[in-house]
Amino acid sequence: PFTTSVADSMIIGLHIEDNVYGPLYFDYLADLDPDDPIMAPRNLFETWINQFAPETVLVLVKASPDAIRNRMAERPHKAGVVQRGDIELVLRRFEEEFQRSALPNKLVIDTTDATVEESVAEFTRRIGPFLTDRDRDRMDSIDADSG
């Protein structure tokens, strides 16, 4: 969000991931209320995003606990953070942070029964209402150049 008006950005995690994983796995932010004064700098992220990049869309990508367990078993990450016993808690915490967020543009993609390709296609279909006129003009220009 802190880029020029010409660039596009994708930020994954940022303060929300910190708020979820920090207390659970990295021994920081534990036992702090979201309104605790020490959280003020983290809470400012959304103020800055709303001020400097109001077109930002917060996307919650989720799946059922069983789907996540199956994916963890089938394709384990070498440096995976989430522990099997914490899946429900992590899902709940991401949902809470998503609902609590002051970012007005929000989208939920449930990948429980979808492939990666299907999830990307769903995102592509559903992001439309959040695109600016400038975004659409740029996309039309790219389509014209490639066609």
PLM features: residue spans?
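Conserved substrate/cofactor phosphate-moiety recognition/catalytic segment
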Residues: 1-10, 16-24
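Conserved catalytic network of the ASCE P-loop NTPase/AAA+ motor domain
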Residues: 2-5, 50-54, 101
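NTP-dependent small-molecule kinase module
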Residues: 74-78, 85-147
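Conserved nucleotide-binding/hydrolysis micro-motifs of P-loop NTPases
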Residues: 15-17, 63-69, 113-115
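A glycine- and Lys/Arg-enriched "phosphate-lid" helix/loop adjacent to the NTP-binding pocket
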Residues: 21, 25-41, 48-97
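Short alpha-helical segments and helix-capping/turn motifs at coil-helix boundaries
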Residues: 1, 43-45
